[in-house]
């Protein structure tokens, strides 16, 4: 098998293997056509022999001989076809195995190249460095977030005590306010803020009313 692989994959290019496979497939197609022709010829000679079996024995025997020749040729073609199919199957399997082996070899080389500069000790050293840097980063963040200046001098406990005192004073004030008796103020009716103006009578209207009054008095005097 190793020599077979070297012939198809080692010393020859991949194109050689592909060309061989294509060539075998073409031969199988040719054998298919040849078998169809021989089978048709066998059927034709069989029909000729049947038709002339009683009327023309000489022609019938000749047809049977040709039929036998075609049958023998068909057997040879079928044998050659089987051999080609077996070879093609073997070549395809060998090529598949070779390609698989090549892929596995390339994968191993790639892993070797990737891991060339790595081992357990180096990985452990790198992880230690990462942890150290993380610790330093946390310390820096803590230092940066620590108040400085006036804020750093403020006593949080003192502020809390002062706040408690203010809250107690507020509660005491509310309690004192609640103890005083409520003062009731009698309700005073609301005074209109503005008096509506009475309608004024115009002077012409007053003259008309006086005139009408005099007319009434004159009528009653009559």
From Swiss-Prot:
Cell location: Cytoplasm; Endosome membrane
Predominant location: cytoplasm
InterPro entries: Snf7_fam
The protein's role, per its UniProt record: Required for the sorting and concentration of proteins resulting in the entry of these proteins into the invaginating vesicles of the multivesicular body (MVB).
Any one GO cellular component localisation term in the record: cytoplasm
Coiled coil: 24-111, 150-176
Signal peptide positions (record): none
Single GO BP term: late endosome to vacuole transport via multivesicular body sorting pathway
Subunit description: A component of the endosomal sorting required for transport complex III (ESCRT-III).
Keyword Transcription regulation carried by entry: no
Domain of life according to the entry: Eukaryota
Region: Disordered, residue numbers: 178-222
Protein species of origin: Schizosaccharomyces pombe (strain 972 / ATCC 24843)
Keywords: Coiled coil, Cytoplasm, Endosome, Membrane
UniProt xrefs under Pfam families: Snf7 (PF03357)
Presence of the UniProt keyword Metal-binding in the record: no
Assigned protein family: Belongs to the SNF7 family.
Basic and acidic residues biased stretches: 212-222
Membrane topology value: Peripheral membrane protein
Official protein name in the record: Vacuolar-sorting protein snf7
């Amino acid at each position: 098998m190793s020599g077979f692989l070297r012939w198809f994959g080692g010393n020859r290019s991949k194109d050689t293997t592909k060309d061989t496979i294509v060539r075998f497939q073409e031969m199988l197609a040719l054998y298919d056509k040849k078998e169809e022709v021989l089978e048709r010829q066998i059927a034709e000679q069989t029909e000729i022999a049947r038709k002339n079996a009683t009327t023309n024995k000489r022609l019938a025997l000749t047809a049977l001989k040709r039929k036998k020749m075609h049958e023998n040729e068909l057997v040879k073609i079928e044998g050659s076809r089987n051999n080609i199919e077996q070879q093609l199957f073997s070549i395809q399997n060998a090529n598949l195995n070779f390609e698989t082996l090549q892929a596995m070899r390339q994968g191993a080389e790639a892993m070797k190249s990737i891991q060339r500069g790595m081992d357990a000790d180096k990985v452990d050293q790198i992880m230690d460095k990462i942890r150290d840097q993380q610790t330093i980063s946390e310390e820096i963040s803590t230092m940066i977030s620590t108040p400085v200046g006036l804020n750093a001098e403020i006593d949080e406990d003192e502020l809390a005590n002062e706040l408690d005192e203010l809250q107690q004073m507020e509660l005491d004030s509310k309690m004192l306010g609640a103890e005083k008796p409520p003062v009731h103020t009698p309700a005073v009716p609301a005074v209109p803020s503005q008096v509506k103006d009475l309608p004024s009578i115009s002077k012409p209207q007053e003259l008309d009313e006086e005139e009408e009054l005099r007319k009434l008095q004159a009528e009653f005097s009559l």
